[in-house]
Structures are given as structure tokens and as C-alpha cells.
Regions:
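A residue-level marker of the well-folded mature domains of exported/periplasmic proteins
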Residues: 2-8, 13, 17-313
Length: 313
């Protein structure tokens, strides 16, 4: 009889733990999942959370500020247990972040920038990555010649990359910027990049030695434009930041202009965000004991023809 009671108690405890695990609800929002990196990030968060038995809801804002705000508002009103946001915008959505904090909902962001209302942002060191990409590009043209720049100001990380590039160029006056395009739209960003860079490439045909873009999605479009113009690998150096199988394939491809990228381990960052959320929101560990500041930095790696085979799957 005693053995039966022990077994019943153990079963009840296991059931309670299972119920508790299943009851933990995580809201996951990516700002624009048509960007490969954001899709990788959000989908990995969802998959890792499900491994823990959590209920997850993965949302795509499709690059629309209004949609992103509404999705955050709805998750807060619903009372989810926690949120992980991929490539969000802390400045634009400060009100939502504050509302989540006031509601006792812990928030971790990924490659979004810091906010006083979130636990922290999981990110590579943008300053290190940006300087590495900038110096690499200039090295491929022997620190002289003409370049075009494709920027993006609305994302914190992309903006930092552009600002670091500007500093590097200032210290290397023998490299001239023939033109730059700043991506303004997020919902139809592919068309924005294609239209802006097509015009710059046409205007400066035959005079461009290198092209820098703030993230790989832009670089892929630029590569297509260059290929359509009849250029061959080596005619122009094309360097960007993010990493992904399509970019690696093009770096390897002798017919592509893609020269190098700085590969961010988005899957590792997403998995780390889920693990940290579990330790803080479920296990009760103090954030300060795990992450002593507003950022949790994850290392990135420059990928070019010398090591691309290590990254291709």
C-alpha cells in the first residue's frame, strides 16, 4: 500500500511538472520574416521553446510598424509568460516594452538594441563585426578606389555598421564614396534596394571597385544586379554582414560577385535566448548573475573563399 502511495505521489508530481511546463506560454515576434535571418531566428526560438514543452506563438510583422505594435499589444493583453523578439525596434516600441515590463512579462530581444524595459539583447558585437567587414572590403581594393554603400538606418545593428563604415572611410581618404543608398522601406525592402542600387550602379558603371551593404539580404539583390549587368567575379568586391547558406553558396560560386560576409550564428543566439529565458523566468535565477549588462554578446566569424567550405551544408 505504501508503495502504491509513493507511485501515486510521484505520478502526481510528474503530472504537475508537465502541466507547469505546458502552461508556460512564450510569445515570439519577428519584424520581417521575408528576411532569411529573421526567419531563422524566430523559427529556432519556437523550436527550442517547444523542446522545453512550452506553448509558443511565432508571429511575423511583415515589416509593418503598425502590425508589430499590434502583435506586441495583443501578446501583452493575452498575458503570455514571456516574449522573445527578433530584430525588433526598442525606440519605436518603447511604450509596448514598458507595458510588458509593467505587466510582469520578461522580454529578451535578439539583434534589436537595448531597452531599459527588457532583460537584455542577444547580439553579436556590431562594432567588431562592422570594422572587420569594412577593413576587409578596403583590403580587397588595396585601400584605394571607388565604392558604393547600401545602408539601413531603421535597425540598430545595421545603423551601427554604417556608422563604423563611415569612420573607416574617413581614415582612408584615398577611397572615395561614389554614392550611397539608404533603405527606407521595410515592408517592400527588396524593391527599395533594387531600385536604389540599380540607379547607382548604372550611374557609375565602370568606375566601382567595391560595394558594401549593411546586411546580406541587400547584398544578394546587389549581386543579382551586377550579374544582370554582365559583371564577373573579381570585377567588383561585394562585402556584407549576416551569413546564411545562400550567401555562402555565392561566395563559393565563381560566377557571383559575393566576396565575403561576417557570419552571425543566429540559431545559436536564438537557442541562447530561450535558455536564458528558462533560467530567469522558470528557474528563478537573477538576470544580473547571468548577464551583467544590457547585452549578451555572441561571437561572429568572417567568411570568404578561404573558409566558406566550413560553413556550406
Amino acid at each position: 500500500m505504501k508503495k502504491i502511495k509513493v507511485l501515486m505521489a510521484a505520478g502526481a508530481l510528474a503530472g504537475a511538472m508537465a502541466t507547469q511546463g505546458a502552461a508556460f506560454e512564450l510569445g515570439v515576434v519577428a519584424f520581417q520574416m521575408s528576411a532569411e535571418t529573421q526567419a531563422r531566428c524566430a523559427n529556432t526560438v519556437g523550436a527550442e521553446a517547444e523542446k522545453l514543452g512550452w506553448t509558443t506563438q511565432v508571429l511575423n510583422s511583415n515589416g509593418a510598424l503598425e502590425t508589430h505594435a499590434s502583435q506586441l499589444d495583443n501578446l501583452i493583453q493575452k498575458g503570455v509568460d514571456a516574449m522573445i523578439l527578433c530584430m525588433s525596434k526598442p525606440v519605436q516600441f518603447d511604450a509596448q516594452f514598458l507595458a510588458a515590463k509593467d505587466a510582469g512579462i520578461p522580454v529578451i530581444t535578439i539583434s534589436s538594441g537595448a531597452s531599459p524595459h527588457t532583460l537584455f539583447d542577444v547580439t553579436p558585437n556590431e562594432y567588431v563585426m562592422a570594422s572587420e567587414a569594412a577593413i576587409y572590403l578596403l583590403g580587397t581594393i588595396n585601400f584605394e578606389g571607388n565604392v558604393l554603400l547600401q545602408k539601413f538606418e531603421s535597425n540598430t545593428g545595421a545603423r551601427i555598421r554604417g556608422e563604423v563604415m563611415d569612420v573607416v572611410l574617413k581614415e582612408n581618404p584615398q577611397v572615395k564614396v561614389l554614392g550611397e543608398h539608404s533603405m527606407a522601406r521595410t515592408k517592400s525592402w527588396q524593391d527599395d534596394v533594387r531600385n536604389g542600387m540599380s540607379a547607382l550602379i548604372l550611374q557609375n558603371a565602370g568606375n566601382v571597385n567595391g560595394i558594401w551593404s549593411s546586411f546580406d539580404g541587400q547584398a544578394l539583390i546587389i549581386d543579382d544586379i551586377l550579374l544582370e549587368a554582365g559583371m564577373k567575379k573579381g570585377d567588383v568586391s561585394l562585402v556584407s554582414i549576416d551569413g546564411g547558406q545562400e550567401v555562402y553558396r555565392r561566395i563559393k560560386d565563381p560566377g557571383s560577385m559575393m566576396t565575403a560576409t561576417v557570419a552571425i550564428p543566429f540559431e545559436d543566439m536564438a537557442a541562447k535566448a530561450v535558455d536564458m529565458m528558462k533560467q530567469i523566468a522558470v528557474d528563478g535565477k537573477a538576470k544580473a548573475d547571468l548577464v551583467p549588462g544590457p547585452y549578451l554578446f555572441i561571437p561572429a566569424t568572417l567568411v570568404d573563399k578561404t573558409n566558406v567550405d566550413q560553413f556550406l551544408k
